[in-house]
Curated annotation (Swiss-Prot):
Keyword vocabulary terms for this entry: Kinase, Nucleotide-binding, Serine/threonine-protein kinase, Transferase
InterPro entries assigned: Kinase-pyrophosphorylase, PSRP
Protein's recorded name: Putative phosphoenolpyruvate synthase regulatory protein
Primary role: Bifunctional serine/threonine kinase and phosphorylase involved in the regulation of the phosphoenolpyruvate synthase (PEPS) by catalyzing its phosphorylation/dephosphorylation.
Biological source species: Shewanella sp. (strain W3-18-1)
Length: 270
């Protein structure tokens, strides 16, 4: 039976999930999880406590409980459950207060709430990424922090959206298609912003598999076409001295982190 995990918060529970996933990923196990956000009242906390206790009664195993709860009275109710508590927020606050010489002033929803200073940057960047996805328009390239290039289905769109959502980076992306292969070159709008260009490439066999799932047995998805496009685009990256990375078998989080590391782009938010 898969171990049971609860992610609980008086906010969005995103922080509890991220922390919990990071820790549990170190173990070669499958977990069954339940996320419970916005536990903002004593009544809701008691309800969650009953869920945790019922889980213990049903399985005979104490569930893991990762939580980031600001209000002490709500946190105490969760503490009194039959779960194994991992309160990472409170674990780090006291030592930091001692080190910084300043008392914390906890506020619910501060981390992922609208009042957070990075909220507007996040929304602007997300809108920019969607408006400038897949070469829809070349009018706003001057406003981009980053322009991702590559063949179709190499990871440009998810990387652009992740960079915008997670770091507030205005990322556009531009695809090189089958029609470009005979005379592959940078459009003028990209040449003007060459310092912002960053390439993504991918193993042709993996690209073939991805395209097959969308357009099976087509010229677009053929291994021959995938090999041709990847080869031509990589040659252009080298010719134009555009930095690039291989996205094969990497998660969007890993791709985004590598891009930031190579480019030195500053995160606009955390």
């Amino acid at each position: 039976m898969a171990p049971k995990v609860f992610y609980i918060s008086d906010g969005t529970a995103i922080t509890a999930e991220v922390f919990g996933h990071a820790v549990l990923s170190q173990f070669p196990l499958e977990f069954e999880s339940l996320t419970i956000p916005f536990v903002e009242t004593l009544a809701k906390a008691e309800q969650v406590k009953r869920q945790i206790n019922d889980c213990f009664i049903t399985t005979g195993e104490r569930p893991l409980v990762f939580h980031s709860i600001v209000k002490a009275e709500i946190r105490d109710i969760i503490y009194s459950s039959e779960g194994v508590d991992y309160d990472f927020l409170n674990t780090f606050v006291a030592p930091l207060e001692q080190h910084l010489g300043v008392s914390a002033s906890p506020v619910v929803h501060r981390t992922h709430g609208k009042a957070n200073h990075g909220y507007e940057a996040r929304i602007d960047a997300i809108n920019f990424a969607m408006d400038n996805d897949d070469g829809q328009t070349m009018k706003h390239m001057d406003q981009a922090d980053l322009i991702l290039l590559g063949v179709s289905r190499c990871g440009k769109t998810p990387s652009s959206l992740y960079l915008s959502m997670q770091f507030g980076i205005k990322a556009a992306n531009y695809p090189f298609t089958e029609d470009d292969m005979d005379n592959l070159k940078l459009p003028e709008a990209l040449k003007r912003n060459k310092k912002k260009l960053f390439g993504l490439t991918i193993d042709p066999v993996r690209l073939h598999e991805i395209r097959q799932s969308r357009m099976e047995n087509s010229r677009y998805s053929s291994l021959k076409q995938c090999r041709l496009e990847v080869k031509e685009v990589e040659m252009m990256f080298k010719r134009e001295r555009i930095p690039y990375i291989d996205t094969t078998n990497h998660s969007v989080e890993e791709i985004a982190t590598k891009i930031l590391d190579v480019t030195g782009l500053e995160r606009h938010m955390f």
